[in-house]
Amino acid sequence: MKRTYQPSKLVRKRRHGFRARMATVGGRKVIANRRSKGRKRLSA
């Protein structure tokens, strides 16, 4: 059985990056929540 986490910078950026978050309403909410909480990193 192969491991579930196969790191890829490209896939990481495309799925969880800032631009990907801003593309949807739900993603924008995620960014807003993380901003209000004061997270240092908003997205991947």
Curated annotation (Swiss-Prot):
User: Which keywords describe this protein according to UniProt?
Assistant: Ribonucleoprotein, Ribosomal protein
* Top-level lineage group: Bacteria
What is the species listed in this Swiss-Prot or TrEMBL entry? Granulibacter bethesdensis (strain ATCC BAA-1260 / CGDNIH1)
What Gene Ontology molecular function terms does this protein carry?
structural constituent of ribosome
Q: Which Gene3D superfamilies match?
A: 1.10.287.3980
Family as reported in the entry's similarity comment: Belongs to the bacterial ribosomal protein bL34 family.
Protein name (record): Large ribosomal subunit protein bL34
**A single GO cellular-component term on record:** ribosome
One GO biological process this protein is involved in is: translation
